[in-house]
Swiss-Prot record:
Keywords: Membrane, Transmembrane, Transmembrane helix. One of its GO terms (cellular component) is membrane. InterPro entries: Mycoplas_M_dom, Predic_Ig_block. This is Uncharacterized protein UU046. The chain crosses the membrane at residues 10-30. It is found in: Membrane. To U.parvum UU044. Its main location: membrane. Residues 56-175 are annotated as: Disordered. Residues 56-76, 98-124 have a biased composition (Basic and acidic residues). Residues 77-97, 125-139 have a biased composition (Pro residues). The keyword Transmembrane helix applies. NCBIfam families: mycoplas_M_dom (TIGR04524), predic_Ig_block (TIGR04526).
Length: 791
C-alpha cells in the first residue's frame, strides 16, 4: 500500500511539473511571438455602441466585437488642408471679430467727415457730377470686400443702367462701409452711393433741362446693416416704452373703474371714443391677448388670477383691458424675426405703430429709415435750405397761416412800405413792401430781402401793379420777390399776362395766390422768358381739382416750383381757407405752341412735344412734375416709375383734334420703356359737331394712349371746351377708317359722355365711309343735311 501511494504521489508531481513547464513555455512563446490578428481581447460591455461608418479604418489591429471599438483611421496627408477654406464664411449680418476689423478699415476715417457732407449740400448746384465726389478711389476697396456676402445687389443694379444709349455717362452705383446712426446707436452699414443723373444733349439744346439741375434723392441707400445687440436692445426699449404710454394706461384704468360694470365696457367705449383710440390700443396686443401664451407675460398677480378670470370675461374689450392692466412689460425684450430683417435693411420699428405678436415679440406695422437716410425728409430739408429763397434748415413745410401771411421760419418780417412811397404806393391801394431778415445770418446765403405784396382784388392796386414793377425795374431797385394774392377773386377773367411780362427777367421769388373759384392759369405763359429761382403757385381753395392745369413751357427757366408747402388734410375744418400749394395733374397748351407755318406734323407739334417731354421725362424727378401720386423708388434714374400729370387740355389749341403726332414715350432713354397714358383729355370745340379729319381719327391714339378697361374708378374721359354742347362726331374727307381708326372712334364714343349714342356725320360724297360706319352700327348722317350744318 505504501508503494502504491508513493507511486501515485510521484506520478502526480510529474504530471504537474509537465503541465507547469508547458504553460511557462507557451507563455514565453506567446510573449515573444507577433500578435495574431485573430486574437481575442476583453471589451467593456458598459460602453455605448460605436459603429464607425468610414471606409478608411485600420483593421490590422481589430478585435472581434459587435462594436467598432479601438479602430483607428488610416492616416492620410490630404485631409489636413480641408479646414483651410473655412475662413470664407461671411453670411451673418453681424461680423465675427476678425471680420469686423477688416470692415472697419475702409470706413476708418474717410467716412467720419460724413456729417459736414450731409448730402443736401451737393444738390443746389450739382451740375452733372455732384454725388460721387470725395471718395471714388476709397470706395472701390470696400466694394470688393463686401460683394462676397451679397453678390446680387451690386450685379443686378447696373443691368438696367446700360440700356440708355449715352456712352459711359451712366456710372454703376458704388457701395462703401460707413458708420450710421439708428435709434441713437452707431453701427456699421454698407451704403450705396447713387451715380449722377443721366442728362441728354437734346434736352439741353432745347431748353428742357433745369438750369440748376435737381436731385430728388441726395442721400445714399442703405444696403445692409451689421446689427449689434446694442441696437436690438435700444430698438426694443423704444417700442416697449410706447406700448406702456401713460395715455394707454389711463384708457385702461377708466375701463376697469369699479363704477363701470364689465358688460357696460363696450357701450362706454362707443359713447366716449369716436376716433377709435381703444381699437388702436387693442390692435397692439390682440395677437398675444388671443392666445394662452399671454400668461407668460403677466405679472405675478395676473398669473394667479388669470385661470379664474378666463371664464369671467364678457367681451373682448373687458378681456383686453384686464390683460393690459396685468402685463409685466419688462418681459417684452425680444424683437420679432420681421423686425430683425428690417433692422438689417436699415429700418427701425416705428414705436407709434408697434405691436406685440403671438409669441410676445416686438414688431411694428411701419418702419422708419435712419434720419440721415430718409429720402423724403432729406429732400424736403434740402429744398427748404437750398431751393427756397428765404430758406431754413428744417424738413417741415410752412403752415397755412405762415403761407398766407408771407412768414418764414427763422426769419423776421417788418413793414418797409414807407421806404417805397416814392414809387407811387399809397395807403389803401392793397400794396405793401415787407423786409425779411434772417434771425441767424449765414455766410454765402441771402440774409436780407424785400417782398412786394399785392392784393389783386383791390382795383387801385391791380391797376398800378404793372407801373410799379416797371418803376422798380427802371431804377434798379433790388426786389427779392413779388407776392400777388386773390388772383381772379372778383373777376375770373382778370388779366395778369401784362403784369407778369413786366417782371424782371431775373427774379429770385414769385408767389401767386389763385382764388378758389378761378382756375385760369393761362397768364403764366408770360413767365417763359423769366429766370426764376423759386415759383410758388398757391390757392386757399381746393388744390386737388382736375381743372388746375399749367403750360409746362412757362416753366422752362424756373429752377424750383415749390411743392413742399402742401397743407391738405382732413383735420382742417371743412370750408375754411387753407393756404396750400396747387397740385397740377393736367398739362395745358396755348395756340402759339402749335406751329401753323411748319410743313410737317412733327415740326408743327415740336413745342408741345417738348413740353410733354420736359414733364414726362426730363424733369420728372422733380416733385412738381409728378402729378398727384409722387415719385417711384428711384426718381432720379428710373423716371418710368414716377407718377406724372394724367390730363391734357387743348382747349386753347383749336388746331389739335386728337392725340395724333403726340409723343408719350422717352425717345432718349431706352430703359424708360413704358409710355405715359392719360385719363383725361379736353379738346377745343364751339359747335355741336366735333370735326376731325380721317387721318386725325385713324392716328388719334385714343385706344393706345388713354387708360381704358380698368375696373378701378375714376373712368377716363374725353371732354370738349363747350361742355355738353358737343353731340356728334363729324369725320371730314374722303376714304375709310383703318382698324385703328375704328377702334379710336369706339373709344371716343365710350369716353366722351356728351356725345349722342353712335351719331356720326360724314361728307355727302364719302359713300364708302358711310357704308363702313353703318355696317359697324353707327347712325350716319349726311353733312349736307340742314339739321347737321353748324353755323
Amino acid at each position: 500500500m505504501k508503494f502504491i501511494k508513493r507511486k501515485t504521489k510521484l506520478l502526480t508531481i510529474t504530471i504537474g511539473a509537465v503541465a507547469v513547464s508547458s504553460i511557462l513555455l507557451g507563455g514565453i512563446f506567446y510573449g515573444t511571438s507577433q500578435k495574431s490578428p485573430s486574437s481575442f481581447g476583453i471589451a467593456s460591455i458598459d460602453q455605448k455602441e460605436n459603429f464607425i461608418n468610414k471606409d478608411n479604418l485600420d483593421y490590422q489591429k481589430a478585435r472581434p466585437s459587435i462594436k467598432d471599438n479601438n479602430l483607428k483611421e488610416i492616416p492620410k496627408p490630404k485631409p489636413q488642408p480641408k479646414p483651410e477654406p473655412q475662413p470664407t464664411p461671411f453670411p451673418d449680418p453681424i461680423p465675427t471679430p476678425p471680420k469686423k476689423e477688416e470692415l472697419k478699415k475702409p470706413e476708418i476715417k474717410p467716412e467720419e467727415p460724413k456729417k459736414p457732407e450731409i448730402k443736401p449740400e451737393p444738390i443746389p448746384k450739382p451740375k452733372p457730377q455732384p454725388i460721387p465726389q470725395p471718395t471714388p478711389p476709397v470706395e472701390t476697396k470696400p466694394k470688393e470686400e463686401l460683394l462676397p456676402p451679397s453678390p446680387p445687389p451690386p450685379k443686378e443694379e447696373p443691368k438696367p443702367e446700360p440700356d440708355p444709349q449715352p456712352q459711359p455717362q451712366q456710372i454703376p452705383n458704388q457701395s462703401t462701409v460707413r458708420k450710421i446712426e439708428l435709434n441713437g446707436v452707431l453701427v456699421d452699414a454698407e451704403v450705396e452711393v447713387p451715380p449722377p443723373r443721366q442728362t441728354f444733349k437734346y434736352d439741353q439744346d432745347n431748353g428742357l433741362s433745369n438750369l440748376n439741375p435737381y436731385t430728388n434723392i441726395s442721400v445714399g441707400k442703405i444696403k445692409k446693416v451689421f446689427v449689434t445687440d446694442e441696437l436690438r436692445h435700444k430698438s426694443a426699449d423704444l417700442v416697449r416704452g410706447n406700448l406702456k404710454r401713460g395715455d394707454y394706461q389711463s384708457l385702461v384704468k377708466d375701463l376697469l373703474d369699479p363704477n363701470i360694470k364689465p358688460e357696460e365696457i363696450d357701450s362706454y367705449i362707443a359713447m366716449v371714443d369716436k376716433s377709435g383710440y381703444h381699437a388702436k390700443l387693442w390692435s397692439k396686443f390682440k395677437k398675444l391677448f388671443d392666445t394662452d401664451n399671454v400668461v407668460n407675460f403677466l405679472n405675478e398677480q395676473g398669473k394667479k388670477e388669470y385661470p379664474n378670470m378666463k371664464t369671467k370675461f364678457v367681451s373682448d374689450a373687458h378681456k383686453y383691458a384686464w390683460l393690459y392692466a396685468h402685463l409685466d412689460f419688462s418681459k417684452f425684450t425680444k424683437l420679432s424675426a420681421n423686425s430683425e430683417k428690417y433692422l438689417q435693411e436699415g429700418l427701425t420699428p416705428d414705436p407709434d405703430n408697434s405691436y406685440v405678436n403671438e409669441n410676445g415679440e416686438l414688431d411694428s406695422y411701419a418702419y422708419s429709415p435712419a434720419k440721415e437716410y430718409n429720402t423724403v425728409t432729406s429732400r424736403l430739408a434740402n429744398d427748404n435750405a437750398n431751393r427756397r429763397v428765404f430758406g431754413y434748415n428744417e424738413w417741415y413745410n410752412r403752415s397755412p397761416n405762415g403761407l398766407a401771411n408771407g412768414d418764414y421760419p427763422g426769419w423776421n418780417k417788418s413793414d418797409a412800405t414807407a421806404e417805397f412811397k416814392q414809387y407811387g404806393i399809397k395807403d389803401g391801394d392793397g400794396i405793401k413792401v415787407y423786409k425779411l431778415e434772417r434771425q441767424k445770418p449765414q455766410e454765402g446765403k441771402l440774409n436780407t430781402g424785400y417782398i412786394v405784396d399785392i392784393d389783386a382784388d383791390n382795383p387801385d392796386g391791380y391797376q398800378k401793379t404793372k407801373e410799379l414793377i416797371q418803376k422798380l425795374n427802371n431804377q434798379n431797385k433790388k426786389i427779392t420777390g413779388y407776392r400777388i394774392r386773390n388772383m381772379g377773386k372778383s373777376d375770373s377773367g382778370q388779366k395778369f399776362s401784362d403784369i407778369l411780362k413786366a417782371l424782371p427777367n431775373e427774379l429770385p421769388l414769385l408767389e401767386l395766390f389763385f382764388s378758389a373759384g378761378s382756375h385760369n392759369t393761362s397768364a403764366l405763359s408770360a413767365l417763359e422768358t423769366k429766370h426764376i429761382k423759386e415759383l410758388g403757385l398757391y390757392t386757399l381753395g381746393n388744390s386737388l381739382l382736375d381743372e388746375w392745369s399749367i403750360n409746362p413751357n412757362a416753366l422752362r427757366k424756373v429752377e424750383w416750383i415749390n411743392s413742399n408747402d402742401y397743407n391738405v388734410s382732413s383735420e382742417y375744418k371743412q370750408g375754411s381757407d387753407i393756404a396750400t400749394r396747387i397740385t397740377f395733374d393736367t398739362l395745358s397748351f396755348d395756340k402759339n405752341d402749335f406751329n401753323d407755318n411748319a410743313n410737317d406734323l412733327r415740326t408743327k407739334l415740336k413745342r408741345i412735344n417738348d413740353g410733354l417731354r420736359m414733364v414726362y421725362w426730363t424733369r420728372n424727378n422733380e416733385p412738381f412734375f409728378q402729378g398727384g401720386f409722387g415719385p417711384g423708388l428711384d426718381p432720379d434714374h428710373k423716371e418710368v416709375g414716377n407718377s406724372y400729370p394724367q390730363g391734357l387740355d387743348f382747349s386753347r389749341v383749336p388746331q389739335i383734334r386728337s392725340l395724333r403726332g403726340l409723343i408719350f414715350k422717352d425717345e432718349q432713354k431706352a430703359s424708360n420703356n413704358r409710355e405715359r397714358k392719360l385719363r383725361r383729355v379736353n379738346f377745343f370745340n364751339d359747335k355741336e359737331n366735333y370735326e376731325m379729319s380721317i387721318n386725325d381719327l385713324n392716328e388719334a391714339g385714343f385706344s393706345e394712349h388713354i387708360v381704358t378697361n380698368e375696373p378701378m374708378p375714376p373712368k377716363s374721359k374725353i371732354t370738349f371746351s363747350n361742355g355738353n354742347a358737343t353731340k356728334r362726331i363729324y369725320i371730314k374727307g374722303n376714304g375709310s377708317l383703318t382698324a385703328s381708326g375704328i377702334q379710336n372712334l369706339a373709344t371716343l364714343f365710350n369716353l366722351a359722355e356728351s356725345l349722342d349714342s353712335k351719331s356720326v356725320v360724314v361728307d355727302s360724297n364719302n359713300s364708302e365711309l358711310k357704308s363702313q360706319l353703318e355696317g359697324l352700327g353707327y347712325k350716319v348722317s349726311d353733312a349736307s343735311d340742314a339739321n347737321y350744318i353748324d353755323i
